[in-house]
Amino acid sequence: MHARIRRHAIAAATLAVTIGLMSLANPSAYAGDTELNVYNWSEYIAKDTVPNFQKLTGIHVRYDSYDSDDTLQTKLLAGSSGYDIVVPTSNFMARQIQAGVYQKLDKSKIPNLANLDPVLMSKIADADPGNQYGVPWAWGTDGIGYNIQAIKKRLGDNAPVDSWALLFDPENLAKLKGCGVSFLDAPDDAFSAALQYMGRDPNSSNPGDYHAAFEVLKKIRPYITQFNSTAYADDLANNDVCIALGWSGDVGVARRRTQDAGKSYEIRFVNPKEGGLLWFDVMAVPKDAAHAEAAMQWINYIEDPKVNAAITNEIFYPTANKPARAFVTPGIAHDPNVYIPDDVMNRMTLAKPRTAEISRLENRLWLQLKSGG
Protein backbone atom coordinates (compact mmCIF):
# COMPACT_ATOMS: atom_id res chain seq x y z
CA MET A 1 0.00 0.00 0.00
CA HIS A 2 1.02 3.60 -0.34
CA ALA A 3 1.52 4.14 3.33
CA ARG A 4 2.84 7.45 4.55
CA ILE A 5 2.45 6.31 8.11
CA ARG A 6 2.83 9.62 9.65
CA ARG A 7 2.80 10.85 13.15
CA HIS A 8 3.12 8.98 16.41
CA ALA A 9 3.52 11.87 18.84
CA ILE A 10 6.91 11.90 20.53
CA ALA A 11 7.67 13.81 23.69
CA ALA A 12 8.83 17.25 22.65
CA ALA A 13 11.19 17.25 25.61
CA THR A 14 13.47 14.88 23.70
CA LEU A 15 13.96 17.61 21.15
CA ALA A 16 14.40 20.31 23.75
CA VAL A 17 17.54 18.73 25.18
CA THR A 18 18.96 18.40 21.69
CA ILE A 19 18.51 22.03 20.63
CA GLY A 20 21.90 23.56 19.93
CA LEU A 21 23.86 20.31 20.03
CA MET A 22 23.30 19.38 16.40
CA SER A 23 24.49 22.79 15.24
CA LEU A 24 28.05 21.70 16.00
CA ALA A 25 28.04 19.39 13.00
CA ASN A 26 29.69 20.72 9.84
CA PRO A 27 27.82 20.68 6.53
CA SER A 28 29.43 18.65 3.79
CA ALA A 29 31.39 20.44 1.14
CA TYR A 30 29.81 20.27 -2.28
CA ALA A 31 32.14 18.19 -4.38
CA GLY A 32 31.31 15.85 -7.24
CA ASP A 33 29.08 13.47 -5.33
CA THR A 34 28.61 10.05 -6.87
CA GLU A 35 26.10 8.69 -4.37
CA LEU A 36 23.00 9.78 -2.52
CA ASN A 37 21.24 8.31 0.50
CA VAL A 38 17.48 8.94 0.61
CA TYR A 39 15.17 8.13 3.52
CA ASN A 40 11.46 8.48 2.73
CA TRP A 41 8.05 7.16 3.74
CA SER A 42 7.29 3.64 2.57
CA GLU A 43 5.71 3.30 -0.89
CA TYR A 44 5.70 7.05 -1.41
CA ILE A 45 7.38 7.36 -4.80
CA ALA A 46 6.89 6.46 -8.45
CA LYS A 47 8.53 3.31 -9.78
CA ASP A 48 10.85 5.13 -12.18
CA THR A 49 11.80 8.13 -10.00
CA VAL A 50 15.05 6.69 -8.68
CA PRO A 51 16.16 4.83 -11.86
CA ASN A 52 15.65 7.94 -13.99
CA PHE A 53 17.62 10.12 -11.56
CA GLN A 54 20.49 7.65 -11.64
CA LYS A 55 20.49 7.63 -15.44
CA LEU A 56 20.31 11.40 -15.63
CA THR A 57 23.06 12.17 -13.12
CA GLY A 58 25.20 9.06 -12.79
CA ILE A 59 24.64 9.29 -9.03
CA HIS A 60 23.94 5.99 -7.29
CA VAL A 61 20.95 6.16 -4.94
CA ARG A 62 20.47 4.13 -1.78
CA TYR A 63 16.77 4.45 -1.07
CA ASP A 64 15.42 3.33 2.31
CA SER A 65 11.99 3.79 3.84
CA TYR A 66 10.41 4.24 7.26
CA ASP A 67 6.88 4.09 8.60
CA SER A 68 6.63 6.85 11.21
CA ASP A 69 8.00 10.29 11.98
CA ASP A 70 9.29 8.86 15.26
CA THR A 71 11.60 6.48 13.40
CA LEU A 72 13.04 9.31 11.33
CA GLN A 73 13.36 11.62 14.30
CA THR A 74 15.27 9.05 16.33
CA LYS A 75 17.87 8.79 13.57
CA LEU A 76 18.13 12.55 13.19
CA LEU A 77 18.57 13.19 16.89
CA ALA A 78 21.25 10.52 17.13
CA GLY A 79 23.44 12.84 15.08
CA SER A 80 24.62 10.37 12.44
CA SER A 81 21.61 9.56 10.33
CA GLY A 82 23.60 8.34 7.34
CA TYR A 83 21.16 10.05 4.96
CA ASP A 84 21.36 13.03 2.63
CA ILE A 85 17.62 13.48 2.01
CA VAL A 86 14.86 12.89 4.55
CA VAL A 87 11.13 13.64 4.33
CA PRO A 88 9.69 14.77 7.68
CA THR A 89 6.14 15.99 8.17
CA SER A 90 6.10 19.76 8.55
CA ASN A 91 4.93 19.85 12.18
CA PHE A 92 7.80 17.53 13.15
CA MET A 93 10.25 19.51 11.04
CA ALA A 94 9.45 22.69 12.97
CA ARG A 95 10.96 21.33 16.18
CA GLN A 96 13.75 19.56 14.32
CA ILE A 97 14.79 22.89 12.83
CA GLN A 98 14.98 24.29 16.36
CA ALA A 99 17.15 21.34 17.30
CA GLY A 100 19.56 22.21 14.49
CA VAL A 101 19.36 18.88 12.70
CA TYR A 102 19.15 20.36 9.18
CA GLN A 103 21.36 22.48 6.97
CA LYS A 104 19.97 25.37 4.98
CA LEU A 105 19.21 24.72 1.34
CA ASP A 106 21.48 26.15 -1.33
CA LYS A 107 18.66 27.60 -3.39
CA SER A 108 21.05 28.69 -6.15
CA LYS A 109 21.37 25.00 -7.01
CA ILE A 110 17.61 24.38 -7.08
CA PRO A 111 16.19 26.47 -9.95
CA ASN A 112 13.02 24.37 -10.02
CA LEU A 113 11.97 26.00 -6.76
CA ALA A 114 10.37 28.52 -9.11
CA ASN A 115 7.70 25.88 -9.81
CA LEU A 116 6.38 25.91 -6.25
CA ASP A 117 3.00 27.41 -5.39
CA PRO A 118 3.64 30.53 -3.25
CA VAL A 119 0.33 30.08 -1.42
CA LEU A 120 1.26 26.58 -0.25
CA MET A 121 4.83 27.63 0.48
CA SER A 122 3.50 30.34 2.77
CA LYS A 123 1.64 27.64 4.73
CA ILE A 124 4.82 25.57 5.05
CA ALA A 125 6.64 28.70 6.22
CA ASP A 126 4.63 28.41 9.42
CA ALA A 127 6.92 25.50 10.28
CA ASP A 128 9.95 26.61 8.25
CA PRO A 129 10.19 30.42 8.33
CA GLY A 130 11.50 31.72 5.04
CA ASN A 131 11.37 28.19 3.57
CA GLN A 132 15.06 27.86 4.33
CA TYR A 133 15.21 24.14 5.10
CA GLY A 134 12.40 22.24 3.42
CA VAL A 135 10.94 21.66 -0.05
CA PRO A 136 7.53 19.97 -0.38
CA TRP A 137 7.34 16.33 -1.36
CA ALA A 138 3.56 15.98 -1.06
CA TRP A 139 0.65 17.07 1.08
CA GLY A 140 -2.66 15.71 2.19
CA THR A 141 -5.46 15.81 4.74
CA ASP A 142 -6.92 13.72 7.54
CA GLY A 143 -10.48 12.54 6.97
CA ILE A 144 -12.77 9.54 6.70
CA GLY A 145 -12.48 6.68 4.26
CA TYR A 146 -15.59 4.56 3.95
CA ASN A 147 -17.37 1.88 1.94
CA ILE A 148 -20.45 3.59 0.49
CA GLN A 149 -22.58 0.47 0.18
CA ALA A 150 -21.71 -0.85 3.65
CA ILE A 151 -22.47 2.47 5.32
CA LYS A 152 -25.82 2.88 3.56
CA LYS A 153 -26.79 -0.68 4.41
CA ARG A 154 -26.23 -0.10 8.12
CA LEU A 155 -27.04 3.59 8.56
CA GLY A 156 -29.43 4.30 5.70
CA ASP A 157 -29.43 6.95 3.01
CA ASN A 158 -29.29 9.77 5.56
CA ALA A 159 -26.00 8.71 7.12
CA PRO A 160 -23.92 11.80 8.04
CA VAL A 161 -21.16 10.97 5.56
CA ASP A 162 -19.99 14.60 5.40
CA SER A 163 -19.37 14.85 9.14
CA TRP A 164 -17.01 13.58 11.83
CA ALA A 165 -20.23 12.36 13.48
CA LEU A 166 -20.06 9.37 11.15
CA LEU A 167 -16.98 8.25 13.06
CA PHE A 168 -17.40 9.77 16.53
CA ASP A 169 -21.11 9.33 17.27
CA PRO A 170 -21.31 6.09 19.32
CA GLU A 171 -24.76 5.32 17.94
CA ASN A 172 -23.38 5.31 14.39
CA LEU A 173 -20.22 3.39 15.18
CA ALA A 174 -22.06 0.70 17.12
CA LYS A 175 -23.87 -0.18 13.91
CA LEU A 176 -20.61 -0.29 11.94
CA LYS A 177 -18.53 -2.49 14.23
CA GLY A 178 -19.70 -5.59 12.40
CA CYS A 179 -18.16 -4.45 9.12
CA GLY A 180 -14.91 -3.19 10.64
CA VAL A 181 -13.82 0.16 12.10
CA SER A 182 -10.19 1.24 11.68
CA PHE A 183 -8.38 4.12 13.38
CA LEU A 184 -4.92 5.39 12.55
CA ASP A 185 -2.47 4.33 15.22
CA ALA A 186 -1.48 7.97 15.50
CA PRO A 187 -2.58 9.86 18.61
CA ASP A 188 -2.22 13.38 17.28
CA ASP A 189 -4.38 12.57 14.26
CA ALA A 190 -7.04 10.88 16.37
CA PHE A 191 -7.15 13.56 19.05
CA SER A 192 -7.16 16.35 16.46
CA ALA A 193 -10.10 14.72 14.68
CA ALA A 194 -12.00 14.34 17.95
CA LEU A 195 -11.31 17.97 18.81
CA GLN A 196 -12.66 19.10 15.45
CA TYR A 197 -15.76 16.97 15.97
CA MET A 198 -16.23 18.83 19.25
CA GLY A 199 -15.71 22.22 17.60
CA ARG A 200 -12.38 22.83 19.34
CA ASP A 201 -8.90 23.73 18.09
CA PRO A 202 -7.17 20.60 16.71
CA ASN A 203 -3.83 22.19 17.67
CA SER A 204 -5.00 23.08 21.17
CA SER A 205 -2.44 23.55 23.93
CA ASN A 206 -5.10 23.24 26.64
CA PRO A 207 -4.82 19.91 28.51
CA GLY A 208 -8.53 20.09 29.30
CA ASP A 209 -9.35 19.81 25.61
CA TYR A 210 -7.42 16.54 25.37
CA HIS A 211 -9.16 15.10 28.40
CA ALA A 212 -12.49 16.04 26.81
CA ALA A 213 -11.44 14.45 23.50
CA PHE A 214 -10.41 11.35 25.41
CA GLU A 215 -13.93 11.04 26.78
CA VAL A 216 -15.28 11.18 23.21
CA LEU A 217 -12.82 8.49 22.13
CA LYS A 218 -13.63 6.31 25.14
CA LYS A 219 -17.29 6.20 24.15
CA ILE A 220 -16.47 4.77 20.72
CA ARG A 221 -13.57 2.56 21.84
CA PRO A 222 -15.73 -0.61 22.11
CA TYR A 223 -16.55 -0.34 18.41
CA ILE A 224 -13.02 0.23 17.05
CA THR A 225 -11.84 -3.07 15.61
CA GLN A 226 -8.25 -2.07 14.83
CA PHE A 227 -5.64 0.64 15.27
CA ASN A 228 -3.64 0.54 12.06
CA SER A 229 -1.60 3.01 10.05
CA THR A 230 -0.03 0.59 7.59
CA ALA A 231 -2.62 -1.75 6.10
CA TYR A 232 -5.92 0.06 6.54
CA ALA A 233 -6.08 1.12 2.87
CA ASP A 234 -5.70 -2.51 1.83
CA ASP A 235 -8.37 -3.42 4.38
CA LEU A 236 -10.76 -0.86 2.90
CA ALA A 237 -10.07 -2.08 -0.62
CA ASN A 238 -10.57 -5.72 0.41
CA ASN A 239 -13.79 -5.02 2.34
CA ASP A 240 -12.18 -6.06 5.63
CA VAL A 241 -13.16 -2.72 7.20
CA CYS A 242 -15.94 -0.38 6.11
CA ILE A 243 -14.80 2.87 7.72
CA ALA A 244 -11.44 4.35 8.71
CA LEU A 245 -9.86 7.46 10.10
CA GLY A 246 -7.26 7.86 7.38
CA TRP A 247 -5.11 9.98 5.10
CA SER A 248 -6.46 11.27 1.82
CA GLY A 249 -3.98 9.65 -0.57
CA ASP A 250 -4.10 6.25 1.09
CA VAL A 251 -7.87 6.14 0.75
CA GLY A 252 -7.51 7.32 -2.85
CA VAL A 253 -5.30 4.32 -3.57
CA ALA A 254 -7.89 2.03 -1.93
CA ARG A 255 -10.57 3.54 -4.17
CA ARG A 256 -8.47 2.94 -7.28
CA ARG A 257 -7.80 -0.65 -6.30
CA THR A 258 -11.48 -1.45 -5.89
CA GLN A 259 -12.20 0.11 -9.27
CA ASP A 260 -9.36 -1.74 -10.99
CA ALA A 261 -10.51 -5.02 -9.45
CA GLY A 262 -14.12 -4.45 -10.55
CA LYS A 263 -15.44 -4.69 -7.00
CA SER A 264 -19.17 -4.31 -6.37
CA TYR A 265 -18.57 -1.63 -3.74
CA GLU A 266 -17.06 1.85 -3.84
CA ILE A 267 -14.60 3.49 -1.47
CA ARG A 268 -14.90 7.20 -0.81
CA PHE A 269 -12.87 9.77 1.13
CA VAL A 270 -14.43 12.82 2.76
CA ASN A 271 -12.98 15.93 4.35
CA PRO A 272 -15.60 16.48 7.07
CA LYS A 273 -17.57 19.71 7.14
CA GLU A 274 -16.23 20.51 10.63
CA GLY A 275 -12.72 20.68 9.19
CA GLY A 276 -9.67 18.44 9.11
CA LEU A 277 -5.91 18.51 9.45
CA LEU A 278 -3.74 19.66 6.56
CA TRP A 279 -0.14 18.46 6.53
CA PHE A 280 2.95 18.63 4.32
CA ASP A 281 5.81 16.18 3.94
CA VAL A 282 8.98 18.01 2.98
CA MET A 283 12.42 17.11 1.69
CA ALA A 284 15.22 18.29 3.95
CA VAL A 285 18.99 17.79 4.16
CA PRO A 286 20.39 16.62 7.52
CA LYS A 287 23.22 18.65 9.03
CA ASP A 288 25.53 15.65 8.76
CA ALA A 289 24.67 14.82 5.13
CA ALA A 290 27.75 13.47 3.39
CA HIS A 291 26.47 14.26 -0.12
CA ALA A 292 24.82 17.67 0.07
CA GLU A 293 25.58 18.47 -3.57
CA ALA A 294 23.76 15.35 -4.73
CA ALA A 295 20.92 16.23 -2.34
CA MET A 296 20.42 19.58 -4.08
CA GLN A 297 20.41 17.81 -7.45
CA TRP A 298 17.79 15.37 -6.16
CA ILE A 299 15.52 18.14 -4.89
CA ASN A 300 15.79 20.00 -8.18
CA TYR A 301 15.04 16.78 -10.08
CA ILE A 302 11.97 16.00 -7.96
CA GLU A 303 10.62 19.50 -8.60
CA ASP A 304 10.72 18.97 -12.36
CA PRO A 305 7.00 19.08 -13.27
CA LYS A 306 6.93 15.76 -15.13
CA VAL A 307 8.89 13.93 -12.44
CA ASN A 308 6.66 15.45 -9.79
CA ALA A 309 3.47 14.54 -11.62
CA ALA A 310 4.56 10.91 -12.00
CA ILE A 311 4.82 10.67 -8.21
CA THR A 312 1.33 12.10 -7.71
CA ASN A 313 -0.05 9.67 -10.30
CA GLU A 314 1.36 6.80 -8.27
CA ILE A 315 0.63 7.81 -4.68
CA PHE A 316 -2.55 9.94 -5.01
CA TYR A 317 -1.08 12.81 -3.01
CA PRO A 318 -0.77 16.27 -4.59
CA THR A 319 2.32 18.44 -4.46
CA ALA A 320 3.06 22.14 -4.26
CA ASN A 321 4.48 22.09 -7.80
CA LYS A 322 2.02 24.17 -9.85
CA PRO A 323 3.16 23.23 -13.40
CA ALA A 324 3.13 19.53 -12.46
CA ARG A 325 -0.65 19.43 -12.33
CA ALA A 326 -0.79 19.70 -16.14
CA PHE A 327 0.95 16.30 -16.32
CA VAL A 328 -1.16 14.59 -13.67
CA THR A 329 -3.69 12.03 -14.90
CA PRO A 330 -7.00 13.92 -15.42
CA GLY A 331 -8.90 11.61 -13.08
CA ILE A 332 -6.50 12.54 -10.29
CA ALA A 333 -5.95 16.18 -11.25
CA HIS A 334 -9.70 16.82 -11.10
CA ASP A 335 -10.38 14.73 -8.00
CA PRO A 336 -11.53 17.15 -5.27
CA ASN A 337 -10.15 14.82 -2.61
CA VAL A 338 -6.66 15.09 -4.12
CA TYR A 339 -6.52 18.71 -5.22
CA ILE A 340 -9.06 20.04 -2.77
CA PRO A 341 -11.12 23.10 -3.78
CA ASP A 342 -10.74 26.46 -2.07
CA ASP A 343 -13.87 26.14 0.05
CA VAL A 344 -12.59 22.87 1.51
CA MET A 345 -9.04 24.20 1.92
CA ASN A 346 -10.44 27.13 3.89
CA ARG A 347 -11.76 24.80 6.59
CA MET A 348 -8.54 22.80 6.86
CA THR A 349 -6.18 23.48 9.76
CA LEU A 350 -2.42 23.13 9.34
CA ALA A 351 -1.01 20.57 11.77
CA LYS A 352 1.31 22.22 14.28
CA PRO A 353 3.80 20.78 16.78
CA ARG A 354 2.49 19.69 20.18
CA THR A 355 4.05 21.19 23.28
CA ALA A 356 6.05 18.84 25.50
CA GLU A 357 3.23 18.80 28.05
CA ILE A 358 0.55 17.99 25.48
CA SER A 359 2.70 15.37 23.78
CA ARG A 360 3.20 13.49 27.05
CA LEU A 361 -0.49 13.75 27.95
CA GLU A 362 -1.63 12.66 24.50
CA ASN A 363 0.67 9.63 24.51
CA ARG A 364 -0.49 8.58 27.97
CA LEU A 365 -4.17 8.89 27.07
CA TRP A 366 -3.63 7.09 23.77
CA LEU A 367 -2.01 4.10 25.43
CA GLN A 368 -4.86 4.03 27.93
CA LEU A 369 -7.42 4.15 25.12
CA LYS A 370 -5.80 1.34 23.16
CA SER A 371 -5.63 -0.85 26.24
CA GLY A 372 -9.37 -0.54 26.63
CA GLY A 373 -10.04 2.98 27.86
Model-derived features: positions:
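Ligand-binding "clamshell"
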Residues: 97-105, 122-124, 128-131, 223, ...
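Short beta-strand->loop
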Residues: 103-114, 165, 261-277, 286-288
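Conserved C-terminal helix/tail region of periplasmic/extracytoplasmic solute-binding proteins
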Residues: 234, 342-373
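A structural signal for short loop-to-beta-strand junctions that line the ligand-binding cleft
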Residues: 81-85, 103-108, 112-149
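Mature extracytoplasmic/periplasmic domains
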Residues: 286-347
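Ligand-binding pocket segment of bilobal, Venus flytrap-like solute-binding proteins
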Residues: 179-194, 198-270
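A bilobed periplasmic-binding-protein/Venus flytrap-type ligand-binding module shared by bacterial periplasmic
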Residues: 145-150, 196-199, 279-291, 310
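Early extracytoplasmic/lumenal segment of secretory-pathway proteins
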Residues: 30-96
